[in-house]
From Swiss-Prot:
GO terms for molecular function: ATP binding; ligase activity, forming carbon-nitrogen bonds; zinc ion binding. The lineage of its organism: Bacteria, Pseudomonadati, Campylobacterota, Epsilonproteobacteria, Nautiliales. Gene3D superfamilies: HUPs (3.40.50.620). The keyword Metal-binding applies. This is 7-cyano-7-deazaguanine synthase. It comes from Nitratiruptor sp. (strain SB155-2). It is an enzyme of class 6 (ligase). It holds the Pfam family QueC.
């Protein structure tokens, strides 16, 4: 059995990859370089986690995201919010990013004969991104299967979607995921800022799980 795992190198996607391995799949890890601020650090983390899993890898460049912009993750003229998580869709949302990622992953899955795509989206304890919602994932699965060969039957698996960050941290520790090799910060590549939404969620998760996050932080 083969599964394509969308692996950013972040904590959630890395734990998702280990879940796929636990489920008995041969892992095909796919990483996207799309002009994000922490592109090099994420790529380093991806390679480290994929190496731990002995996964076949694809590193896909999607430079057109920089032409689209419209997100603080890509456009350095838009500041990364550091006031805490607020209601609504934040400026760190990248327009339809997961839809595009899933489409590319589906093409790879069809080529490789994989029956599943794993993605580490989290609905309940996230920044409110619309492309992390379960309804969206279900509709993408239907669209993928409608637009591929008749014998293709791909399931999109989201093992973390209803978990809170502390549960995700505990799961990662129980699976032996080297969380110190993962990277979540939206802004920095040397030391995590400790203030962006992603850092705040990660730190809160470790704190509530009663565990220590071993990556370096500028501010905690």
């Amino acid at each position: 059995m083969k599964a394509v795992v969308i692996l950013s190198g972040g904590m959630d996607s890395s734990i998702t990859a280990y879940m796929a391995k636990k489920d008995g799949y041969e892992i095909i890890a796919v990483h996207f370089n799309y002009g994000q601020r922490t592109e090099q650090k994420e790529l380093e983390a991806f390679r480290a986690i994929a190496g731990e899993l002995n996964a076949k890898t694809y590193e896909i460049d999607l430079p057109f995201f920089e032409q689209i912009g419209a997100s603080a993750l890509i456009d350095t003229n838009i500041a990364i919010p550091k006031q805490g998580i607020e209601p609504g869709i934040p400026v760190t949302y990248v327009p339809f990013r997961n839809g595009i990622f899933l489409s590319v992953a589906a093409a790879i899955a069809e080529k490789e004969g994989a029956d599943s795509i794993y993605i580490g989206v989290v609905e309940e304890d996230s920044s409110g991104y619309p492309d992390c919602r379960e309804d969206f994932i279900q509709k993408m699965e239907s669209a993928i299967n409608a637009g591929t060969k008749p014998e293709t039957d791909i399931k999109i698996k989201t093992p973390l979607i209803h978990l809170r960050k502390e549960d995700i941290v505990q799961l990662g520790l129980s699976l032996g995921v080297p969380l110190e090799k993962t990277w979540s910060c939206y802004e920095s590549e040397d030391e995590a800022c400790g203030e962006c939404d992603s850092c705040r969620l990660r730190l809160k998760g470790f704190e509530k799980a009663g565990a220590k996050d071993k990556i370096p932080y500028k501010s905690t």
